Amino acid sequence: MAKEIKFSDSARNLLFEGVRQLHDAVKVTMGPRGRNVLIQKSYGAPSITKDGVSVAKEIELSCPVANMGAQLVKEVASKTADAAGDGTTTATVLAYSIFKEGLRNITAGANPIEVKRGMDKAAEAIINELKKASKKVGGKEEITQVATISANSDHNIGKLIADAMEKVGKDGVITVEEAKGIEDELDVVEGMQFDRGYLSPYFVTNAEKMTAQLDNAYILLTDKKISSMKDILPLLEKTMKEGKPLLIIAEDIEGEALTTLVVNKLRGVLNIAAVKAPGFGDRRKEMLKDIAVLTGGQVISEELGLTLENAEVEFLGKAGRIVIDKDNTTIVDGKGHSHDVKDRVAQIKTQIASTTSDYDKEKLQERLAKLSGGVAVIKVGAASEVEMKEKKDRVDDALSATKAAVEEGIVIGGGAALIRAAQKVHLNLHDDEKVGYEIIMRAIKAPLAQIAINAGYDGGVVVNEVQKHEGHFGFNASNGKYVDMFKEGIIDPLKVERIALQNAVSVSSLLLTTEATVHEIKEEKATPAMPDMGGMGGMGGMGGMM
C-alpha cells in the first residue's frame, strides 16, 4: 500500500491537532467539578465517565497523522494510570500545554534539541522540589483524603479503602469486585486463605454452615499424591497420641486413603480434614513452602529426600485455627517463626521487583499478602450496569493512587504543588535551553487553571492569586475558596505528580523533535459499475406480440 510522508511544520501541526482534540475531550473531567463524558459503545448502552484515561482510550481520529499524535498522548495517560493510578488528566493537560508552547517557539526558529534539553532540566529540578515538599502519609485520615480525591470526591469509597488498608497493611492485597446489591461492602479475610475446599463433605464439623473447623491443629504438607493408607499410617498414629486435629494438604488424596480417613472421622477415631494443595506446577510448590513457613512446618517432598512413611511429628506445621468450606481453606494464627516469615516476605518482594510479567507479579503479590497482611475485598454496589462499571473504575484508580501515596508520600493537591515547586526553581540557562525551561514554567500552571475553569472560575485569575502566596496556600475548587490545602485535606500523592510531569515532558519532547511522519494513504473504495444493458436492444422485436 502507498504511503504518504509529511515533513517538519506540516507534520508537527497535524500531530498537534490530534493532541488538541484528545486534550479537549479529556480536560473537562479534571478536578472536583469536572464534567462527565458520554462514550458510545459498539454494543449495549453508552458509558458515562469522569475518568480521563477511560475517555482517552476511546479516541481514534480519522486523520492518520493527527491520530498518531493522539495515540502518543493516550499512551502517556495509560502509562501514568498504570504506574500511579491517577494523574492521567494532569499528564494529558501538561503534555498539551508543553507541546503547544514548544511548537510556537520551534516554528519561530528555536532548536528542538536545545529546547528539549532545557525542558528536561526544568522538569528534573521541579521534581526535586516536589520531593522536598512532600510528607509521609500520617494515618488513616490522610489515606481517606487521598482515596476520596482520587475517587472523584466520593467520601464513602475513600473510607472503604482506608478501612481496607488499615486492616491488611501496606503489603496486603485489596481487590475490587461487583456487589450483588446496591450497597458498597468491605470483606476482610484474616490469615492465609487459598481456593481449595474439603475433599469430602464428611469432614464437616458445623453442619449448619457446612464448614470444618480445626483448633490447635497439626498440618501435614506434601507435594505427593496419597492413594494408599500405608503411606500416612505411621504419621497418623503419632498425631493421635498427641490428641490434636490434623489437616492434610497434598497434591491429591484418593481411593483407599480418602475412604479410610472419612470412615475414621465418622467413627470419631480421627479429628481430621483433607484438601488439595493450592496452585499448579512450580507455583504449587512455592505456595506449599509459604504455608510451611507460616505454620513452622516442612513440605514432605521426595526432592528433599523426605517420604511420608518416615515423616516425624516435627515436620508438621501448627495453626491456632483452620476453617474449611467447600471452596476455601483459611489458616489463622500460624505458629511459624516471625523471622522465617520476614525472610520469606523479603524473598517474594525481590521476585516482584525483578519479574517483567504482569501475571507473575499479580500472583506474587497475592502470595505476599497471604503471608504478611491479609486480603480485603471491596464490593462495589450500583443500581445499573453502566454506573457499576464507572464506579468500579473509580475505586480501582483510587486504590492505586492511595498505594502511591503510602509509597512516596503526599503533596498539596489541586494543581498547586507544581506551582509551589516551580517557584523555588531558578536555573541559569542560555539560548534555546532557556526557552525549554520557560516552556515548562508556563505549562505547569495549566492543571490549576483547568481545575478552576471546570469549576466555573477564571483560570488565569486563580493561578495569579495562588502564585502571590507561599506554603500550602491553594484553591479549593469545590467551594471557590483559597485555603490551606493540607488542613482542608486537598492532597495528591507525590508519585502521581512526579510521573504525570515526567511522562508529559517525555512525550512532548518526542513530538517536538519529530521531523517527519509516515502513514498509509487511505484508498477510496471504487463505486461498483452498473451492469451492461446492451443486450436489452433485442426487446424491440417484442412489438409483434400486439
Swiss-Prot record:
It holds the Pfam family Cpn60_TCP1. It is an enzyme of class 5 (isomerase). SUPFAM superfamilies: GroEL apical domain-like (SSF52029), GroEL equatorial domain-like (SSF48592). The gene is groEL. Its main location: cytoplasm. This is Chaperonin GroEL. GO terms for cellular component: cytoplasm. Forms a cylinder of 14 subunits composed of two heptameric rings stacked back-to-back. Interacts with the co-chaperonin GroES. Keywords: ATP-binding, Chaperone, Cytoplasm, Isomerase, Nucleotide-binding. Together with its co-chaperonin GroES, plays an essential role in assisting protein folding. The GroEL-GroES system forms a nano-cage that allows encapsulation of the non-native substrate proteins and provides a physical environment optimized to promote and accelerate protein folding. It comes from Helicobacter pylori (strain Shi470). Gene3D superfamilies: GroEL, GroEL-like equatorial domain, TCP-1-like chaperonin intermediate domain. Belongs to the chaperonin (HSP60) family. CDD domains: GroEL. ATP binds at residues 29-32, 50, 86-90, 414, 492. The keyword Cytoplasm applies. The keyword Isomerase applies. InterPro entries: Chaperonin_Cpn60_CS, Cpn60/GroEL, Cpn60/GroEL/TCP-1, GroEL-like_apical_dom_sf, GROEL-like_equatorial_sf, TCP-1-like_intermed_sf. Its EC number is 5.6.1.7.
